Curated annotation (Swiss-Prot):
Pfam families: BTG (PF07742). Overexpression impairs serum-induced cell cycle progression from the G0/G1 to S phase. Coiled coil: none annotated. Residues 138-165 are annotated as: Disordered. One of its GO terms (biological process) is negative regulation of mitotic cell cycle. Belongs to the BTG family. One of its GO terms (cellular component) is nucleus. It comes from Sus scrofa. It comes from the Eukaryota. InterPro entries: Anti_prolifrtn, BTG, BTG-like_sf. This is Protein BTG3.
Length: 252
């Protein structure tokens, strides 16, 4: 277990020194605290007869879902340094198993072996050389792969506009491509006066009501003529069938 933990600590110190944000004393203090934390964590979860057992528990992982590894953060706090000063990648996974330590940069890349051990007799210099060789190789491949993909992407971006302008279309003009014609819309029929909205308000004033018709928009009663009883003047009498004027019957 000592060799595997030493490989992990060398791996982290190598990354921190490449970032060149911490002093040598701070890096050594961080390496010492991380070694003690991993030894305490792994001592009851180490199975040489079955290396895959407890692998998830021993794993050191940093990604978009877990941006800070708790063990590494604890080592930073115990050594009085900031986690951000380590300069770790945004996606990093370390599997610490008996006789082998593996790493993966990024969640979609392939894993590589940081160090493998056949016995516990290897000294720190040999472990440091193994970690350094593996780390130098993977970091160079990782950065060169990302840069080559960026160059391919930029080439594709440059080629696509040329392919379009090399074969112009004889049908469409630039003005048609930039400013397409507006669709033709049929005018809506005008609303009849007196239409009402659903909320009870009028859209327009209702037309005047013709003479003799009741006003449909109001609740007033329609006009009805009042019956008048005719009363004959004094001196005029009438029977059932005709009127009799006494002045007309007097002799002249």
């Amino acid at each position: 277990m000592k060799n595997e933990i030493a490989a992990v600590v060398f791996f982290f110190t190598r990354l921190v020194r490449k970032h060149d944000k911490l002093k040598k004393e701070a890096v050594e203090r961080f390496a010492e605290k991380l070694t003690l934390i991993l030894q305490e964590k792994y001592k009851n979860h180490w199975y040489p007869e079955k290396p895959s057992k407890g692998q998830a528990y021993r794993c050191i992982r940093v990604n978009k879902f877990q941006r800070v590894d708790p063990d590494v953060l604890k080592a930073c706090e115990n050594s009085c340094i900031l986690y951000s000063d380590l300069g770790l990648p945004k996606e990093l996974t370390l599997w610490v198993d008996p006789c082998e330590v593996c790493c993966r940069y990024g969640e979609k890349n392939n894993a590589f072996i940081v160090a493998s051990f056949e016995n516990e007799e290897e000294n720190k210099d040999e472990i440091s050389k193994k970690v350094t060789r593996a780390l130098d190789k993977v970091t160079s491949d990782y950065h060169s792969g990302s840069s080559s993909s960026d160059e391919e992407t930029s080439k594709e971006v440059e080629v696509k506009p040329n392919s379009v302008t090399a074969t112009p279309s004889p049908v469409y003009q630039i003005s048609e491509l930039i400013f397409p014609p507006l669709p033709m819309w049929h005018p809506l029929p005008r609303k009849k006066p007196g239409m009402y909205r659903g909320n009870g308000h009028q859209n327009h004033y209702p037309p005047p009501v013709p003479f003799g018709y009741p006003n449909q928009g109001r609740k007033n009663k329609p006009y009805r003529p009042i019956p008048v009883t005719w009363v004959p003047p004094p001196g005029m009498h009438c029977d059932r069938n005709h009127w009799i004027n006494p002045h007309m019957l007097a002799p002249h």
